[in-house]
């Protein structure tokens, strides 16, 4: 008994260690903010031939010149005196100062590139910018998403190219009145055209693969849930479908320019729909009791509605409402991770062996939440954030447990069908044998009757 407990908690420690190493590896090697590349300083990025060969693609995080509360053209920046400060992308999600962080308004970002004299084609990938912008190279307007002056939003992941050999000034004038994030939230990627295109292609292929796998899993789950009358399999199909919708957004933003509403509301809804469905399904598998299950399901459903309404009202939110939602998200995610871990532990103590994979996945998801708090400056180059990986681990563990039951049940069903065929075959053979015996008995009775008749006739003679 003691040996079993030691093995169980040794396995738990190993899961926590491996998941922590996994998240630390993501932070170090798959993080736009931890790339060991030269960054801009005071609005200027100077790169040599050797630096471009060493790092053909980099993410422009630091050293942006920023003009708050103004939509400016390059000529206006050069000819007039405007208030300016330097900032790093990701340190805030709004146009204003940290003392008054409102996401609504406008601002202008600028950076000057000093590139090698050799004329090579360079590429600049512009991720989703909230929510409309004009992009200038030197004095020329080369890209417009939405209408910044009129506040009409349009969002898409875009790429522009230009030739080096001379200083190039990049100016991005942004306005936002429709989303709870404002401005350039995610750092743009800059480098040689081949390197930037390769990074985009790998990211697109990864997202497309994730969408395909989750969609196929959803279809298979719906098929087996209908065939075998299993509600848990149907719920897992809904989880896969929600994860497919969530992972399809990078693909959507690469292929099409879309408005903020309703697409980002749907994305926010899918995030918390996955969490709520995981809670519901794990309650059904681990069976913590009626009251804990009812409370957790109700809280998850209420937060899902809250997140949906928050997304619907994204263009009319006060600063207090934004801060309250951020604090609520933190508390909800922490409580969800802790609750899923506790009910998995209790299920294992009750002797439910099929809950063991879910227990280890919940431990990995808890580690994901902890590292998400300890390492907040993280944005993946490829794939999802820490908490998305945690949700994936739990969904995969639940899927493994369910599919194991489905396969076992399907195998038993096939065995039962084969046994039924054997019984039907034996019954038909018995029926045929009984018919033959009955016919033989009837024939014997006829012969006996004829013999008796002949004997009676002989006696009379």
Regions found by a protein language model. Name each.
Residues 2-4, 244-420:
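Interfacial "cap-and-anchor" motif at the non-cytosolic start of specific transmembrane alpha-helices
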Residues 22-31, 192, 196-227, 326-348:
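First transmembrane helix
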Residues 217-245:
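Juxtamembrane interface at the cytosolic side of transmembrane helices
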């Amino acid at each position: 008994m003691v040996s079993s407990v030691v093995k169980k908690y040794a396995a738990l420690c190993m899961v926590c260690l491996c998941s922590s190493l996994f998240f630390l590896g993501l932070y170090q090697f798959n993080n736009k903010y931890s790339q060991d590349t030269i960054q801009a300083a005071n609005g200027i990025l100077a790169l040599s031939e050797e630096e471009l060969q060493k790092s053909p693609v980099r993410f422009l995080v630091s050293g942006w010149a920023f003009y708050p509360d103004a939509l400016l053209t390059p000529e206006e920046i050069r000819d007039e005196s405007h208030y300016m400060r330097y900032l790093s992308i990701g340190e805030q999600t709004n146009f204003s100062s940290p003392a008054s962080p409102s996401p609504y308004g406008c601002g202008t970002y600028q950076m000057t590139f000093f590139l090698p004299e050799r004329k090579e084609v360079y590429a600049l990938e512009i991720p989703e910018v909230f929510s409309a912008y004009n992009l200038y190279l030197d004095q020329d307007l080369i890209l417009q998403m939405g209408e910044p002056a009129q506040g009409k939003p349009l969002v898409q992941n875009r790429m522009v190219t230009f030739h080096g050999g001379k200083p190039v000034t990049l100016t991005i004038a942004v306005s936002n009145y429709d989303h709870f994030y404002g401005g350039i939230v995610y750092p743009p990627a800059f480098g040689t055209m081949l390197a930037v295109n390769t990074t985009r292609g790998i990211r697109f292929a990864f997202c497309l693969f994730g969408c395909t796998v989750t969609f196929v899993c959803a279809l298979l789950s719906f098929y087996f849930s209908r065939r075998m009358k299993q509600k848990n399999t149907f719920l897992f199909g809904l989880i896969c479908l929600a994860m497919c919708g969530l992972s399809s957004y990078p693909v959507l933003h690469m292929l099409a320019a879309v408005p903020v509403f309703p697409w980002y509301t749907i994305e926010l809804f899918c995030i918390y729909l996955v969490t709520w469905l995981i809670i519901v399904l794990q309650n059904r598998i681990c069976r913590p009791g009626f009251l804990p299950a009812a409370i957790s399901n109700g809280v998850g459903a209420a937060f899902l509605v809250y997140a949906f309404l928050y997304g619907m009202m994204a263009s009319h939110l006060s600063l207090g409402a934004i801060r309250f939602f951020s604090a609520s998200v933190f508390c909800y995610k922490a409580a969800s991770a802790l609750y899923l871990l506790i009910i998995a532990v209790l299920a294992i103590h009750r002797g439910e062996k099929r809950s063991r994979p879910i227990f280890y996945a919940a431990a990995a998801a808890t580690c994901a939440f902890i590292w998400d708090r300890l390492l907040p400056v993280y944005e993946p180059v490829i794939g999802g954030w820490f908490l998305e990986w945690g949700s994936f681990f739990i969904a995969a563990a639940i899927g493994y447990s369910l599919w194991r039951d489905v396969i076992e049940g399907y195998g038993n069903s096939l065995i039962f069908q084969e046994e039924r065929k054997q019984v039907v075959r034996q019954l038909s053979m018995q029926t045929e044998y009984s018919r033959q015996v009955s016919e033989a008995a009837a024939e014997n009775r006829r012969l006996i009757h004829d013999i008796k008749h002949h004997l009676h006739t002989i006696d009379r003679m």
